[in-house]
């Protein structure tokens, strides 16, 4: 079976869907990035970009960190750097760790179910 050429509207629809998918999973990704301990904002961005396809800008990450802080999932503090500007470090609260565990479980169940449904597509089935 050959693939039909994609139209501009189809490509746009897929792009919008991908944006929504990223937005929906970014909170979990940030919580997971903080699992190992304190990181400042740019370190979080680098962690998300390393070995993944999660390209996130500063205009996205800082409002998200503020929301996670308002929800009591992360804490932050300014730390003077030996050279350069002070950096704001973020880390998970106990509630943040619990939320990350629970979200990870939901994600594993959801992605497992979806991968099972996608099996025939990945195998190139015609039906």
Model-identified regions with their sequence ranges:
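Basic, amphipathic "hinge/linker" alpha-helix immediately C-terminal to the N-terminal HTH DNA-binding motif
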Residues: 82-104
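Short polar/acidic secondary-structure junctions
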Residues: 53, 79-81
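Glycine-centered, phosphate/nucleic-acid-interacting loop/turn motifs that mediate DNA/RNA or nucleotide
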Residues: 72
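Amphipathic alpha-helical dimerization/coiled-coil segments
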Residues: 3, 98-127
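N-terminal helix-turn-helix DNA-binding core of bacterial DNA-binding proteins
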Residues: 18-62
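Short beta-strand "wing" residues that participate in macromolecule-binding interfaces
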Residues: 76
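Intrinsically disordered, low-complexity serine/threonine- and proline-rich regulatory segments
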Residues: 1-25, 103
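Short, hydrophobic-biased segments on the C-terminal half of alpha helices
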Residues: 62-69
């Amino acid at each position: 079976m050959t693939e039909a050429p994609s139209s501009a509207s189809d490509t746009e629809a897929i792009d919008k869907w991908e944006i929504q998918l990223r937005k929906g999973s970014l909170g979990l990704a940030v919580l997971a990035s903080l699992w190992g301990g304190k990181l400042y904002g740019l370190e979080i961005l680098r962690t998300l970009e390393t070995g993944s396809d999660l390209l996130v800008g500063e205009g996205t990450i800082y409002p998200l960190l503020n929301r996670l802080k308002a929800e009591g999932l992360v804490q932050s503090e300014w730390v003077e750097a030996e050279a350069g500007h002070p950096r704001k470090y973020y880390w998970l609260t106990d509630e943040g760790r619990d939320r990350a565990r629970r979200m990870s479980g939901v994600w594993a169940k959801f992605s497992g179910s979806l991968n099972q449904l996608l099996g025939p597509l990945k195998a190139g089935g015609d039906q």
